[in-house]
Amino acid sequence: NLLSSLLKKEVVYNFRENDILNGGQGAPLAPIFHNLLINQNQIERPACVLNVGGIANITLVVSKNNEDLISFDVGPGNCLLDEWVRRHTQMKYDENGKASNIGKTSEVILNQAIDNFDNISNQKKLSFDIKDFDLSFVKGLSYEDGLSTLVDFTAVIIYQSILKSIKIRENEKLLIIVCGGGRKNLSLMGSIRKRLPKNISLKIIDDYKIDGDFIESQAFAYLAIRSALKKVISYPNTTNVEKASIGGI
C-alpha cells in the first residue's frame, strides 16, 4: 500500500475484516493488550479495564489467558459530553470537567434517561455506536446543567453495567483501571467513583506510570506484531466472533 511504499517498511492493517467474516463485530480489539498490561504490572485479578472513548467499553481480566477475557461496550463514554460542548461553545470538550462541575444535575431527567437506556441496552449484544444516542433529553437545560446531567448519566450507565456484568462478593475486591480520553474528565471520574461500593476501587492507567494517551497506538502496534506472527487477536468473548481469529494484512 501507499504507506508501506513511502516508508519502505512492512505495514499491517485491516485488523477487523477477518473477525467480521467469522461472525464477529470487529471490535473491541484492545482487550488482549489490556491483559498484557495487567500481566506486566502484576496487577491482582479480577481486574477491569474501563476504556472511556466516544463509547465506553470494559475488559474483564480474570486470568492470564486471553481466552478468558470478557469485553463489551457499556454505553456512551465521551460522545454525548463532547457533542453537547460543541453545540454550545467553540470548544471540542469540557477540559477536566470544569463546566459540568458548575452545573446542577436534573434528577428527574437523569432517571428518565436511565430508564430509556435500559430499554435500548436490553436489545443490544456487545457493541454500541455513537448514533445509538442523542442529546434530546437534556435539550431544555442550560449549558452547565445539561453537561452535569450528561456526566451523571454517563457515570450511572458505566457503574450499573459494571455491577451487572461483574459478579463479585462483598468481601472480594475489584480494581477498575481507566484509560481513554475520558479518564481526564475529573467530573466524570468523580461521579463514577462516588457510586462504587467500598470493595471496588478506581485508578487511571497513568497511576502505573503508563502514558494513557498512547494506549490505543501501543495496542495496535501489539496487534500488528501478533498479526505478523499469525497469532490470534480476537476471541468469542471479546468480539462475539465464532472462533478465535487472527487478523490484519
Regions found by a protein language model. Name each.
Residues N22-I32, G146-I157, E216:
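A glycine-rich, Thr/Ser-enriched phosphate-binding loop motif common to dinucleotide/cofactor-binding enzymes
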Residues D152, K203-I249:
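Glycine-rich phosphate-binding/hydrolytic loop that grips phosphoryl groups
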